[in-house]
Amino acid sequence: MKQEPTTYQPEEIEKKIYEICSHRGYFEINGNEKIQEKGKRFCLMMPPPNVTGILHIGHALTLSLQDILVRYKRMDGYKTLYQPGLDHAGIATQNVVEKQLLSQGVKKEDLGREKFIQKVWEWKEKSGGAILEQMKRLGVSTAFSRTRFTMDKGLQRAVKLAFLKWYEKGLIVQDNYMVNWCTKDGALSDIEVEYEERKGALYYIRYYLENQKDYLVVATTRPETLFGDSAIMVNPNDERYKHLVGQQVILPLINRTIPIIADAHVEMGFGTGCVKVTPGHDFNDYEVGKRHHLETIKIFDEKGILNAHCGEFENLERLEARDKVVAALKENALLEKIEEHVHQVGHCYRCHNVVEPYVSKQWFVKPEIAQSSIEKIQQGLARFYPSNWINNYNAWMRELRPWCISRQLFWGHQIPVFTCENNHQFVSLDTPLSCPTCKSEKLEQDKDVLDTWFSSGLWAFSTLGWGQEKSDLFNESDLKDFYPNTTLITGFDILFFWVARMLFCSESLLGELPFKDIYLHALVRDEKGEKMSKSKGNVIDPLEMIEKYGADSLRFTLANLCATGRDIKLSTTHLENNKNFANKLFNAASYLKLKQESFKDKERLNEYQTALGRYAKSRLNLVTKEVRNALDNYRFNDATTLLYRFLWGEFCDWFIEFSKVENEAIDELGSVLKEALKLLHPFMPFISESLYHKLSNTELENAHSIMVMPYPKEIAQDEKLEHEFEVIKDCIVSLRRLKIMLETPPIVLKEASVGLREKIENTERLQNYAQKLAKLEKVSVITYKPLKSVSDVGEFCQTYADLENLDLSPLIARLKKQLEKLEKEKLKLNLHNENFVKNAPKSVLEKARESLKTLLEKEGKIQQELDLLEQP
């Protein structure tokens, strides 16, 4: 016979429970079919992690919160869809496969597009999506049979359809425009650029007038871009330069002339008051160039290599060219000075390459696409949790610029735009055979792919079958049943990358916002509040934490620390504490199991007959009401705190203790714990499942899972009985304090009395519990104060010990010894020494006086006790 473990061993049960529940289809839409209630629908989309990704602590937080909510709704009778999937992650995935090929001496350009994409698919099938398996370790109950991939056949069609619809409405256009350009990864949208503060330099360059005697000094952080200058600009009201407007200056190093122009854009008090205008390589200058009809000159190619506009510097890499340009300026006496300068430098979010403003012909989504979604958010048709995030959303949407959606990659959704030999351009959902305008069969598809966020922006409805032919991955009724989705849970860091785009993509195509509630959680940091990084050595690996503490402890900890709007400071101490919590529950169930073989499910308060059973169930019902309210309002931390306080602070610390007096209540306490485990299940699915079956004397292999049982709903309370037990608890605690105060060997307190501030119905019950749990032979309930007694004051009572028949001399001797010790400690402070007081540093004196204050307080309390004990 297998020996029962003495402590909770998560590794022995987690995999087994997960596999059984998954195999039975509990995670699927109809997994809870027997308890589904008509008209109740719940849908939550998993933010699709990158196919290259592995589970990190941020994923663990998002997935834990999502799964808690999904399990709650599933148990509460909702037809539930928790939609899983993976993102093709264009740049990231291409980089992974590219590196693998380079290690074999193969470049992607040598393979060509089709063969390279074939290699990516091979990699995806072999190594991609490891994160989905890792999610299972966390207990994530998502509908894995419906897993979608943003490059699967159906979603490719949905992407093309969205592009076609927006193209036909004029919301997608192709144009030459200033974009963020990574010389490695190509065009980036504004929010794919990360800005870092860098120490750089400000170069003051001389631009000579045509007379070659006078010059203007212009400051720049990017001297290599001077070859693209189209003008020098001054403020029209600047008296220093008014007379020069309209004249020409000579461009340093290459002797091309450019005009001096006037524009109110220039701040007269900044720098020299003169600025260079480089329309081809600066966002502001690009707009200035359009206003003044200046030439836009590109000085480097897509790889950042300087071109013929740069004279002798042609073929140098842009950043490498900087030092050589500066050296040439010095050599030709064209450099006035160099100053240290701290400024923000944009980097590619993926490869951290320095990003350049660059004019390029790209595809864009116009900002007008978002207008309707913005208006609906203002009308309150979707709510943000915490509510302050709507301010961030509004601020960003007000400044929305055209979204650059074309990317210079092989891997991704190839833009479905075709051009024939006669330059007719059209969009097609399928591969066309001929041009619809001129019937030419010589067609070429646009080589660029769409921004990864284009396809993930459709996630809320494309996964439900929108724009696709029939598939086993969705049902025909899914859009009707699950769109709009109910809730979105994700990190605030992708509010603009993903959430805002889903809002306007969904509203634009389906006429409704994609979800009703948007919960944005904070970031997980280390215990000091610092960002986790490998270089700091403070990264907490969720898989390692699951190995060490169990999935339940990690889930419960993350939910408990997820206070609304605050960053999460995670430490292994938190995980250890919640592993101990799991073990406490294990011990409570084991204790009950020793007393009785199995326990029934009792959902209603009126089924409980013993006073302790009714009290415990009444308290559970209050917690049920509060936990439901917390979950309905996304207060995950409040829900975990309520459960922890009830299960440890009440059930384990009090109800179990009370049962040692009222043994007949054991049966009903087992039923209360079973109901409480259902309440706990969404947070700690494994231990709740295991202990439920332990108390039922069943095995999951042959019984229904707790996860498809109804979530507790009963909220009826017996408030009178609850109050009576609160009074009893208060009396016991007070009596225990009294014993600690008085009991010094050989003194043993055998009798005490209790004075109540208000009457309770059953004083006999109070006396019975108090005698047993405070370990006294007799407890009397009185309405007067004994003449010679010491007392302790509680919230609902005052307890007394009669001193008449006690030999108090050992206690008096102990207290006097404590007074002597305190007197010596006071002398050590030296505050009686005038020289010390006169010469000691202020901080030392303050510390000594604070210590004296503490000692005097202790002395006063002890003296008060002595006076009481020595009274005649």
Curated annotation (Swiss-Prot):
Keywords: Aminoacyl-tRNA synthetase, ATP-binding, Coiled coil, Cytoplasm, Ligase, Nucleotide-binding, Protein biosynthesis. Gene3D superfamilies: 2.170.220.10, HUPs (3.40.50.620), Isoleucyl-tRNA Synthetase, Domain 1 (1.10.730.10), Valyl-tRNA synthetase, C-terminal domain (1.10.287.380), Valyl/Leucyl/Isoleucyl-tRNA synthetase, editing domain (3.90.740.10). Its EC number is 6.1.1.9. It comes from the Bacteria. ATP binds at K534. It is found in: Cytoplasm. A motif ('KMSKS' region) lies at residues 531-535. Residues 810-871 form a coiled coil. The keyword rRNA-binding does not apply. Pfam families: Anticodon_1, tRNA-synt_1, Val_tRNA-synt_C. A motif ('HIGH' region) lies at residues 49-59. It catalyses: tRNA(Val) + L-valine + ATP = L-valyl-tRNA(Val) + AMP + diphosphate. One of its GO terms (molecular function) is valine-tRNA ligase activity. Monomer. Belongs to the class-I aminoacyl-tRNA synthetase family. ValS type 1 subfamily. ValRS has two distinct active sites: one for aminoacylation and one for editing. The misactivated threonine is translocated from the active site to the editing site. This is Valine--tRNA ligase. It comes from Helicobacter pylori (strain J99 / ATCC 700824). The lineage of its organism: Bacteria, Pseudomonadati, Campylobacterota, Epsilonproteobacteria, Campylobacterales.
